[in-house]
Amino acid sequence: MSQQTTPAPGVTKVTFKVTLTSDPKLPFRVFSVPEEAPFTAVLKFAAEEFKVPAQTSAIITNDGVGINPQQTAGNVFLKHGSELRLIPRDRVGGSSLAR
């Protein structure tokens, strides 16, 4: 079970609601992270919460726009808002090579 820690004074946090799109029940998690946290850490944390591999996952907006993880969580929040979707990359486009 994870522990909640009290943020240092002056640390601004942003809150995201991340939905797992590969599950028909569309489960979601809500969590807050420091504004300056790298978004790659947010992606990794969200993937771990849903027990999917972070290396083969991506986060997109509700409109289907991909998010570049090489920015801060605060930047993503300002550009795309708080509602995001986690999608395992094996579910994105592509074609099967098996015949």
UniProtKB/Swiss-Prot annotation:
Q: What's a GO cellular component annotated to this UniProt protein?
A: nucleus
Q: What GO biological process terms does the UniProt entry carry, in alphabetical order?
A: protein K69-linked ufmylation
Give the record's keywords alphabetically: Isopeptide bond, Ubl conjugation pathway
For this protein, the record's Gene3D superfamilies field holds: Phosphatidylinositol 3-kinase Catalytic Subunit, Chain A, domain 1
Q: Name one Pfam family in it.
A: Ufm1
* Positions of the propeptide removed during maturation: 94-99
| InterPro entries in UniProt | Ubiquitin-like_domsf, UFM1
Cross-link Glycyl lysine isopeptide (Gly-Lys) (interchain with K-? in acceptor proteins) mapped to chain: 93
Which cysteines pair up through disulfides? They are: none
Function, please?
Ubiquitin-like modifier protein which binds to a number of as yet unidentified target proteins.
Q: PANTHER family from the xrefs? A: UBIQUITIN-FOLD MODIFIER 1
User: What family does the database annotate?
Assistant: Belongs to the UFM1 family.
* Name of this protein: Ubiquitin-fold modifier 1
